[in-house]
C-alpha cells in the first residue's frame, strides 16, 4: 500500500425485523482490535439493513482480526439476527475536500 492509503472493510447485513438492538449488542466487539483506525455503523431505516465500515492500517491487521477467536465469537452471537450478509475489502484513500 502507498502512503495515505487505508484498508476499508465494508459489511452489509439484512437483519430480522425487530432485532436491531439485540443485533447491535452482539455486533459491537468486546475490544477494538489493533490496527483498526475507525469504525462506523450505518442503518438504512425501514429496510433492516446495517452497514459496517471499518478502516484499517493494513490488510494484515484486518485479516488477523477476521481470523481471530474474538471475531468468531462475535459472528456467532450475531447469527440469530442476520438474514443475509455480504462484505468486501478495499484499499482507498481519503479525498481532500477544498475549504473555501
Predicted regions and their residues:
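Short S/T/G/P-rich N-terminal loop/turn motif that feeds into the first structured element of a domain
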Residues: 1-72, 77-100
